[in-house]
Amino acid sequence: MKKSLLLFFVLINCLNALTFEEVYTIQKNEGSMKALSGYKQLAQENDPKAIHELAIIYLTGDEIAKNINKAHELFKKASELGNADSTYFLAKIYLSDKTIYFDEKKAYNTFVDAANQNNAKAQLMIGRFFLMGGIVPKDYEKALHYFKLASKQKEYDANCYIAYMYASGTGVFPNFGRANTFAKDEYEKGNKLCVKVWNDYNLGKYPKDEGFRIGDYNEPVK
């Protein structure tokens, strides 16, 4: 009799279980508090997307108290389960000197892990590290490589950095026309970084790329 009841309740729970997509829809339509129990249930089942969303809720304090420690724990768990977005957020926590987890070396290594998982935002960050130096020595060739990887995934801030490198001749031969090509769309959208590069180097005067078409990425993905 007891076994029958146990099997009955297990069956009921299975029938009532929500998918990640269903819980995510609840969150978007009714708020994070309504979705919390669903995410927690899925997290117990090691659903990496649910664990990631739960971590975001704790990180931002979306309808609950902020809890950086819980967010860190959850991002780490989801990252270990292969969620590249969680790996990126984990790296951001390590990069913040406002947390007890601040560790620039660990931040860099974790961003690299996320970049290797094809996370575009992490690729952008690694590009910035190599462009600016500090955490790692400056390496303009690597910076451009990572900016291009991010740009190919439509991480549009990367186009502004590529434009800057071509306009300033940082690590590449100066090419104002190519800088124009990479900056133009984001400049027109009001992206502050691209606006600065556009104005600083007067890129409106150079509408055509007159340079040699070397390499496989001479204009941005739209």
Which residues fall in each region the model found?
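Sec-dependent N-terminal signal peptides
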Residues: 4-13
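Structural signature of tandem alpha-helical TPR/SEL1-like repeats
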Residues: 28-37, 65-74, 100-110, 137-146, ...
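Canonical positions in the second alpha-helix
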Residues: 39-42, 78, 113-114, 149-150, ...
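Terminal, low-structured helical/coil segments at or just beyond the last alpha-helical repeat
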Residues: 174, 178-222
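Short helix-capping/linker turns of helical repeat alpha-solenoids
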Residues: 31, 44-47, 60-62, 81-83, ...
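Hydrophobic face of amphipathic alpha-helices that form TPR/SEL1-like repeat modules
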Residues: 22, 26, 53-60, 64, ...
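N-terminal leader/linker segments that initiate helical-solenoid repeat arrays
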Residues: 15-53, 214, 222
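Alpha-helical adaptor scaffolds
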Residues: 85, 89-99, 105, 109-116, ...
